[in-house]
């Protein structure tokens, strides 16, 4: 039996976004996803359970499952708030999937963290960001902080979470 796709049922290649389920509506990643949708991009959001940006076993398991189910070569937007729970999964899939991080701030620099907690978070963020094909940031300060973690300058792209930023992100994804 052959199933034929009718022209009206054809869909464009979908983007995938992995982000915390409880991410506020005004968060950079969520606003960028909405800007992409408004620009006509097909989007599937994979929401991770648990608190963020804390490391959470349920979010780690959900991240492992979500990434394993994605098709080879899929463009995947990773919200920076989810990087702690994705860090263990990323090395297994960084050659198979096209990861782009949406980072509004680095969490390792949170002043409420102890020195040990900050060091752990810095290592997790640095390792995760090193596996990204590109890192999208909303401002120059965040771009400088990401570059300070060793991410190559040509991989860090400043883009507002609006129509212009969505167009810039779509151009980045098309070039990957």
Whereabouts are the PLM-identified features?
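N-terminal subdomain of nucleotide-sugar transferases
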Residues: 1-50
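Short beta-strand->alpha-helix junction loop in the catalytic core
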Residues: 52, 158-167
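Short N-terminal targeting/anchoring amphipathic segment
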Residues: 63-87, 98-100
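Active-site proximal beta-strand in glycosyltransferases
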Residues: 75-77, 92-111
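Alpha-helix capping/helix-boundary segments
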Residues: 82-83, 141-143
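Membrane-proximal helix-turn-helix segments that form the acceptor-binding/catalytic region
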Residues: 116-135
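Helix-loop-beta element that forms the nucleotide-linked donor phosphate-binding surface
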Residues: 143-162
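C-terminal alpha-helical cap of glycosyltransferases
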Residues: 164-176
């Amino acid at each position: 039996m052959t199933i034929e796709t009718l022209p009206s049922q054809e869909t464009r290649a979908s983007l995938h976004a992995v982000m915390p389920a409880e991410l506020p509506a005004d968060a950079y990643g969520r606003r960028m996803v909405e800007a992409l949708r408004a620009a006509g991009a097909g989007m599937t959001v994979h929401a991770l359970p648990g608190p963020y940006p804390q490391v959470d076993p349920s979010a780690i398991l959900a991240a492992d499952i979500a990434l394993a189910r994605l098709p080879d070569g899929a463009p995947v937007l990773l919200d920076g708030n989810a990087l702690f729970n994705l860090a263990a999964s990323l090395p297994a899939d960084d050659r198979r999937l096209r990861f782009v991080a949406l980072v509004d701030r680095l969490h390792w620099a949170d002043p409420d963290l102890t020195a040990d907690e900050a060091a752990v978070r810095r290592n997790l963020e640095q390792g995760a960001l090193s596996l990204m094909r590109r890192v999208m940031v909303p401002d120059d300060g965040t771009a400088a902080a990401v570059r300070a973690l060793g991410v190559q300058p040509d991989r860090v792209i400043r883009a507002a979470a609006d129509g212009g930023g969505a167009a810039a992100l779509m151009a980045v994804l098309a070039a990957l």
